[in-house]
A protein has these predicted regions:
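Oxidizing extracytosolic/periplasmic lumen-facing domains
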Residues: 1-103
């Protein structure tokens, strides 16, 4: 380890940086779960979802985090979800949470 390495900031994971930026600056819209992938135990681990921005429909896939996996019944096909997307690049999006009846 060189002397200058001590002063360098560790590089942030690009996926973590993207998610943090969308959580800070992204616009919110509603989307719909189209498909849900399950593991051997039947827990939903990944979803395919769609959303529409300015009459253009986008589709994306997201691996659910542990908090989202604990509420797998909220991510069944046809369920409504909240999406955060980049207004300059609407195809860049993340799932914020599932929308329940009580909002």
């Amino acid at each position: 380890m060189s002397f200058l390495d001590r002063f360098r900031r560790p590089k942030e994971d690009p996926e973590v940086a993207r998610r943090n930026r969308l959580l800070r600056e992204g616009r919110i819209t509603e989307g719909c779960v189209m498909e849900a992938t399950q593991d051997i135990q039947g827990n939903v681990t990944q979803i395919l979802y769609s959303y529409e921005i300015n009459s253009v429909e986008y589709e994306s896939v997201e691996i659910l985090n542990n908090d989202q996996r604990s509420r797998t019944s909220a991510y069944v096909p046809g369920a409504t979800i909240l999406i955060r997307y980049d207004p300059r690049q609407p195809g860049n999006s993340i799932v914020v949470k599932a929308v329940t009846g009580d909002r």
